[in-house]
Amino acid sequence: MAKIKLTKNELKVQKDALKMYRRYLPTLTLKKQQLQSEIRTIEAKAKAVRKEREDLEFGFKEWIAVFSEMDAFPEGIITVSNIRKGKGNIAGVDIPTFEGADFGRGDYDLYETPLWVDIAANHMEKAMSLDLEAEVLDEQVRLLEIELLATSQRVNLFEKVKIPETEENIKKISINMADQQVSAVVRSKISKRKIALRNAVASEKEVYSL
């Protein structure tokens, strides 16, 4: 704890600081709660997207087995040509949003290639799109967790350090100022008594001199 001046001006500084901490703490606490809620929501969405991806793969596993046996699925038939991302903002945090993906198809003869290859390619695009969406959601969570950590640290700083420290400073300064006031009153009374005593002695001397 830094050493403080036990003065009236310092008392005002400490009271203003305490007022500021108490004013901003509810806002920080609300932001912390909002971030926690948003993170849970996004994590649930990412889980749902991955579940959809798993269901898609499970429903298509027979096709995958056929591809493996026949070795007829062209290698590199699907490529991601572009990932479309937008921008969002949650609790003051800029985050990427997934808006879709563009895919390229490798060269293959539509007339000579079995129809199931084209159907499989469509399923692969859907699966890859879900993977990309989940990755963007993971990035959202990562960015929000960074902000949540910083916000939580500020909340803890205000609650456990700054507010108690400032309250203690105010108490310390107030006690010191009260002690000074008492001392000033005592000194004033002593001074008045001394003056009265001197006046009395002077009066007695005047009487004796007559």
Pin down the residues of each PLM region.
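Charge-rich amphipathic alpha-helical interaction elements
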Residues: 1-210
